[in-house]
Design a protein with these regions (language model features):
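Conserved SAM/SAH cofactor-binding pocket of Class I
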Residues: 34-147
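Mobile active-site "lid"/loop adjacent to the S-adenosyl-L-methionine
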Residues: 138-167
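Conserved Class I SAM-dependent methyltransferase catalytic core
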Residues: 21, 162-219
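SAM/dcSAM-binding transferase cores
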Residues: 217-260
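Short, structurally constrained coil/turn elements
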Residues: 10, 65, 93, 199-202, ...
Length: 260
């Protein structure tokens, strides 16, 4: 049995429990949380779809949450949700950040979003007209695009299984309040699919930022901000370089990680 790891991830001395044999978060989750914080400014109710062990809710709450902010993380992996709940306890955030086990595909197809979860944060958001903010770092690879060559947990985190891209966006639109904001991280190769799905779900892309490994290279990550029922105008932010060309994190990434 794999020994569970307790990582000190920074951001106000946050701790995160992770199983090394399962999928562990990467830089894309961190930059998504920072991207959301820089645009949303704050929130009353937020949800993270496909939350894994909960790193995005913890970081975004640190960067943009307030005393009355509440976050709900949803994932279909019971083991990951168990670790996320324990991390919430370790960080003294049990009241502010809740986690629940459920399938995004079922949420996308359910008749009543309010009835999907009995959790207090979920019910509070639904009674408030929906979530103010939804974040998601969904699987990047479409169904049938690759042969499983890794552990089941890692494969499910990277490849669409039950819920596809449409399912994640339908679920987000279902639980957002009118003019609520979605923040998504994905691969540029899926950008056309993302925009088509967003428009079908009334999620209007408003802000986009490409992420490159180093300055001058092609982007391998894209950050997208959408507004439910928003007007048609798309703003491009300057590219974000992860590395500085010498193998170290760029100055902006170090600022995002709050190391400088």
């Amino acid at each position: 049995m794999t020994e569970i790891r307790t990582d000190d991830i920074g951001f106000g001395n946050l701790k995160l429990l992770q199983d090394p044999s399962e999928f562990c978060y990467g830089v894309d989750a961190v930059i998504l949380a920072d991207f959301a914080a820089s645009i949303c400014g704050g929130y009353r109710y937020a949800a993270d779809l496909g939350t894994g062990t909960g790193v995005i809710p913890f970081i975004l709450h640190h960067k943009a949450g307030s005393g009355d902010s509440r976050y709900f993380g949803l994932d279909f992996n019971e083991g990951s949700i168990g670790l996320a709940r324990e991390s919430s306890r370790l960080n003294g955030l049990c009241e502010q950040i809740h986690f629940g086990c459920g399938d995004i595909a079922e949420l996308a197809g359910c008749a009543s979003a309010k009835a999907f979860a009995e959790d207090g944060v979920w019910q509070g958001a639904m009674e408030n007209g929906g979530f103010d903010v939804v974040t998601s770092n969904p699987p990047y690879f479409a169904k049938g695009s690759a042969i499983p060559a890794e552990g089941a947990g890692k494969f499910r985190a990277r490849h669409e299984t039950t819920a596809d891209l449409d399912g994640f966006l339908q679920a987000a639109a279902k639980i957002l309040k009118r003019r609520g904001q979605l923040f998504l991280v994905h691969r540029p190769s899926r950008l056309v699919d993302i925009f088509e799905s967003c428009r079908r779900c009334r999620l209007e892309p408003k802000t986009i930022r490409f992420v490159v490994p180093e300055a001058g290279q092609a982007p391998n990550i894209v950050l997208i901000h959408c507004v439910l029922g928003g007007g048609r105008e798309l703003k491009y932010l300057p590219q974000l370089a992860v590395y500085d060309g010498r193998g170290s994190y760029s100055r902006e990434i170090q600022k995002i990680y709050e190391r400088i």
